[in-house]
Amino acid sequence: MFMVQHTLLSDDIAHARFACDISRCKGACCVVGDAGAPVSRSEVAVLKKAYSQLKDRLSAESRDKVIVNGLIQESTDKKLELSCVRSGECVFVQYTDTGVATCAIQDAFYKGEFDWEKPISCHLYPLRIKKLSGLEWINYEYIPSLCSAACDRAEKEGIYLADFLKKPLIRRYGESWYTEFVAACEHIRTMKKEYSNEARNELSSGELTNNKSRVEAEKGVNNTRPST
């Protein structure tokens, strides 16, 4: 675990490679899960505005869900989350002609039709934020069925999670925080690399010592054999 200003972060965030590959995952993070995306109370008004403006683009099932249960629900631990239809997809999901699930809010944002991109919890995924003793604790939520395509792409292209999520992290915490965060990640990676090299050298040195001892022992045995 490491700390950047007022946030705690799990070490795997520094090492993880991640870059969405929506052509493969088909927007799975928008349609799979036991609950809807977490939202803050400060986001409620803009989400209601988005729904009012975009509801005609959404499925009939999504609109029915909102009529019956509301756009935003409260979980058992009193946290707010977006409503989902029975199949698990967010009520704001819409599909492309190729079957990719996309966010209606984000789509409208990119087209210049809405002035807000999407909930910060969606923007930051696969990072999840929890409150811990007055601090924010950020974890990397790796779910193979959702994240494997993104991890495969990132490994091939050499993209770190910390770099891929630059925009939402700055949106959440600001430029100065992000600069410190990147520096901390680079330091952690360097330390791990140096430790790995040291461990490898020690292992090689140990193997050489063992081999030398074994050779000397064999010589000793040969020298003490009785002549015939």
Report residues per predicted region:
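Short loop/turn segments that flank or connect secondary-structure elements
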Residues: 1-228
